[in-house]
């Protein structure tokens, strides 16, 4: 499996795990006396989505694959959701909980688990 794809998937998984923990904290904001690194994790996830998109859209071995088309679509929607959250002045636990519950984000994660397994088998 391409190192770039592998690293991007790994970063998305790490970020999602942090998002689950942040959502449970009940915070009204990521700012204040004890700022949270949630914004950093969301930004890393967003950047990883960019990397995956460029890898999947331009790699010839993924051309004409309906599954990859769906993966790309799910990544684009998830990336857009992350961008919306990153534009917010305050990122609350509730916002992150809603991101976690998004069918688009969950679909992307499931797609990436499948893609990761398929690419491991091919190498």
Where are the regions a protein language model picked out?
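Short, solvent-exposed, charged loop/turn and helix-capping segments
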Residues: 48-69, 88
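Short terminal alpha-helical segments
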Residues: 1-39, 111
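Alpha-helical transition-metal enzyme core signature, strongest for iron centers
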Residues: 12, 45, 75, 105-109
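Short, charged, amphipathic alpha-helical segments
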Residues: 32-39, 69, 95-103
């Amino acid at each position: 499996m391409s190192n770039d794809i592998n690293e991007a998937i790994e970063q998305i998984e790490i970020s999602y795990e942090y998002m689950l923990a942040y959502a449970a904290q009940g915070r009204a904001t990521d700012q204040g006396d004890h700022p949270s690194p949630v914004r950093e994790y969301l930004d890393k996830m967003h950047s990883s989505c960019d990397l995956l998109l460029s890898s999947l859209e331009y790699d010839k071995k993924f051309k004409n694959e309906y599954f990859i088309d769906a993966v790309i679509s799910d990544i684009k929607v998830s990336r857009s959701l992350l961008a919306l959250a990153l534009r917010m002045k305050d990122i609350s636990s509730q916002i992150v909980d809603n991101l976690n519950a998004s069918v688009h984000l969950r679909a992307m994660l499931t797609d990436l688990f499948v893609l990761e397994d398929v690419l491991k088998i091919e190498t």
